[in-house]
């Protein structure tokens, strides 16, 4: 197969892996009823006028299954940290002590679990669409290269087959990631 086709397939592979990583990252921030530092990954704290990731202004730990402890490096950061977590649309209610913030993780209701599963499935679908869009773009590049005579018809056919296989594997992996997260959320 021609190097152009190989380059296109390598790019496709890399972009599918990136999509899978992005899905894992997004799903790590989804609440499951147990404490996880990833829950607070998207929380931004107002640090002297700049929205800053929480883990850049404090140390986070999980001492118990349903508790996250946030220990700011500066005591003056306690009120903004509390506000950022409360405003983070995570359904969490932080409480401050003199030098740290405790974030109890409430148990999820059955209704809330089902809602979260819906969100998880939706994120999975969005990422499947992203994978298919990557395949479509790569397919167009192969077709243009074939039309321009840069690769032969046989090489184009082989590349399209490999592309489809790669896409199917990516979609299957997304299904596996979503199923694992679903199981995690529904587990009481």
Curated annotation (Swiss-Prot):
Keywords: Cytoplasm, Protein biosynthesis. One of its GO terms (molecular function) is ribosomal large subunit binding. The keyword Nucleotide-binding does not apply. GO terms for cellular component: cytosol. It holds the Pfam family RRF. It is found in: Cytoplasm. CDD domains: RRF. GO terms for biological process: cytoplasmic translational termination. PANTHER family: MITOCHONDRIAL RIBOSOME RECYCLING FACTOR PSEUDO 1, RIBOSOME RECYCLING FACTOR. HAMAP family: RRF (MF_00040). Belongs to the RRF family. Responsible for the release of ribosomes from messenger RNA at the termination of protein biosynthesis. May increase the efficiency of translation by recycling ribosomes from one round of translation to another. This is Ribosome-recycling factor. It comes from Anaeromyxobacter sp. (strain K).
